[in-house]
Amino acid sequence: MAAAALLRRSPAARALLSPALSSRLVASKPHSSSPAPPPPPSKAGANTKTFSIYRWDPDSPSTKPHLKDYKVDLSDCGPMVLDVLLKIKNEQDPSLTFRRSCREGICGSCAMNIDGDNGLACLTKISSASSASTISPLPHMFVIKDLVVDMTNFYNQYKSVEPWLKRKDAPPQPGKEIPQTKADRAKLDGMYECILCACCSTSCPSYWWNPEEYLGPAALLHANRWIQDSRDQFTKERLDSINDEFKLYRCHTIKNCTHACPKGLNPAKHIDTIKKLQLEA
C-alpha cells in the first residue's frame, strides 16, 4: 500500500513502474462491499393494457357475437400480439380459440384483424397506445369460433388456378429438374413467397362483395406466378381460364391487398400484369 501511496504523489514513480506491477496495483484497488440497491418496485397496473377480443361460440347460440375485454400485464409478456393471445389463453380464459403454429410469419395460421388492419399476430407488435386494442377475425369470412374463420372458399379459389407446374412436353432429362436461367428465376420473386394467410383477399372490398365469383388477390398472384414460370407450358390456357369479368376484372385496383400483405408482396401489381397480358394475347 506504501507503493500505491507513492504512485499517487509522484508522476515520476508511476513512469518507472513496470507494467506487471502497475496492473497488480490497479487490480488491488478496493471495491465497495455493499450490494447495489434494488430497482424501485413498479406501480401496480403501470404496464397493463386492455385487449377487446371478438368472441362467438357456435355451441352457445343464445349468446351473440361480442367483444370481451381482457387486461394483460405487458411487463410479463412477449412483444407480439400472439404472445398476448397465448398469455390470455394460458392464464385467464382457456376457451379463447385462435389458429397459430410457427410463430415466425411462415405458416400464415394466425392471420386476423388487429386494430383495423389485417396481419399476422406473430409479426404484429403490441400497440404502444394507451387505448384498448381490438382483435377480431379476418373480415367478411364465416366464423367457425372466436378468431377462427372458414378458409374453404379461399383454398378452393387457390386450387382453381391450378398452382402447379403443367407441361405438354416431357422433361429434357427424365427424372431431373427442368433448368431455369437466373433471369427467369428472378421473375418469380415477389410471388413464390406468398404464405396463403388471406390477409390480402379479406382486405379487398371487391372480394367482400363477390367472394364466390372474384378469385381475389392471393389466387391471382399465384396464377401469375405460374404464368411467369418459364418451365410451364400452359400460359395461354391459364390466361384464358381467368379471362372473366368477375374472376379477374372485378379487381378495381384499390390496393388494400398490397397494404395488408405481411410479407411485403404486391398482389395488385401482379393482377395488373395479368390484365396487360390479356390485352396482348
UniProtKB/Swiss-Prot annotation:
GO terms for molecular function: 2 iron, 2 sulfur cluster binding; 3 iron, 4 sulfur cluster binding; 4 iron, 4 sulfur cluster binding; electron transfer activity; metal ion binding; succinate dehydrogenase (quinone) activity. [4Fe-4S] cluster binds at C194, C197, C200, C261. It is found in: Mitochondrion inner membrane. Residues 26-48 are annotated as: Disordered. Residues 184-214 form the 4Fe-4S ferredoxin-type domain. InterPro entries: 2Fe-2S_ferredoxin-like_sf (IPR036010), 2Fe-2S_ferredoxin-type (IPR001041), 2Fe2S_fd_BS (IPR006058), 4Fe4S_Fe-S-bd (IPR017896), 4Fe4S_Fe_S_CS (IPR017900), Beta-grasp_dom_sf (IPR012675), Helical_ferredxn (IPR009051), SDH/FRD_Iron-Sulfur (IPR050573). Residues 49-141 form the 2Fe-2S ferredoxin-type domain. Pathway: Carbohydrate metabolism; tricarboxylic acid cycle; fumarate from succinate (eukaryal route): step 1/1. Its main location: mitochondrion. PROSITE patterns: 2FE2S_FER_1, 2FE2S_FER_2, 4FE4S_FER_1, 4FE4S_FER_2. Keywords: 2Fe-2S, 3Fe-4S, 4Fe-4S, Electron transport, Iron, Iron-sulfur, Membrane, Metal-binding, Mitochondrion, Mitochondrion inner membrane, Oxidoreductase, Transit peptide, Transport, Tricarboxylic acid cycle. Iron-sulfur protein (IP) subunit of succinate dehydrogenase (SDH) that is involved in complex II of the mitochondrial electron transport chain and is responsible for transferring electrons from succinate to ubiquinone (coenzyme Q). This is Succinate dehydrogenase [ubiquinone] iron-sulfur subunit 1, mitochondrial. The lineage of its organism: Eukaryota, Viridiplantae, Streptophyta, Embryophyta, Tracheophyta. The gene is SDH2-1.
